[in-house]
Amino acid sequence: MAASKDRENFVYIAKLAEQAERYEEMVESMKNVANLDVELTVEERKKGVAILDFILRLGAITSALGAAATMATSDETLPFFTQFFQFEASYDSFSTFQFFVIAMAFVGGYLVLSLPFSIVTIIRPHAAGPRLFLIILDTVFLTLATSSAAAATAIVYLAHNGNQDSNWLAICNQFGDFCQEISGAVVASFVAVVLFVLLIVMCAVALRNH
């Protein structure tokens, strides 16, 4: 009688142990699934940031090359002239505007060359090397874009308002089309600068969360 009761207790304890083992396996499986979901969420977030990086680079390319092209084609000749003088305004009459065209062309060229690295960050969201490479060069070309845009802005301001202290006369009353073109080029260059800042901030955040 006692042996039968001991056997029943042993079987009962064995069943409890088996159930406890199954419960532990189930809990472990749930933890693995939860961790996998977190990893997928982080990867998807980084991939989304990489896709946005690519889109912003396309926008910056359009702005930079558009600014360079608009400035390079800015030219206006007044319909009247004298025997010895012809009144013309062109970007190559100003060394600052020449620097602007060259700088924005370099910026646009760099952005085009940076697209493959941006694509790599989409394919491999966890890769830190391409992001670090991009953030360094983005900072360099942001400096170039900002300096050229700021210098051109100063000349555009003088073209619109002149400077009485230096006896510099405003020319936009006579060369209206020319001033519209150079003003549009400067605005486009600052759009590129803003997009550069966004790109750098995004890369920095992505590297910080790596």
Curated annotation (Swiss-Prot):
TM stretches of this protein: 49-69, 99-119, 132-152, 185-205
Residue intervals on the Cytoplasmic side: 1-48, 120-131, 206-210
Cited Pfam families: CASP_dom (PF04535)
Record-linked InterPro entries: 14-3-3_dom_sf, CASP/CASPL, CASP_dom, CASPL
Gene Ontology biological process terms, A to Z: cell wall modification; cell-cell junction assembly
Keyword line: Cell membrane, Cell wall biogenesis/degradation, Membrane, Transmembrane, Transmembrane helix
Record membrane topology: Multi-pass membrane protein
Subcellular location: Cell membrane
Extracellular side: 70-98, 153-184
Gene3D superfamilies found in the cross-reference section: 14-3-3 domain (1.20.190.20)
GO annotations of cellular component type: Casparian strip; plasma membrane
Family statement drawn from the similarity comment of this UniProt entry: Belongs to the Casparian strip membrane proteins (CASP) family.
Quaternary assembly: Homodimer and heterodimers.
Function: Regulates membrane-cell wall junctions and localized cell wall deposition. Required for establishment of the Casparian strip membrane domain (CSD) and the subsequent formation of Casparian strips, a cell wall modification of the root endodermis that determines an apoplastic barrier between the intraorganismal apoplasm and the extraorganismal apoplasm and prevents lateral diffusion.
Protein name: Casparian strip membrane protein 4
Species of origin: Glycine max
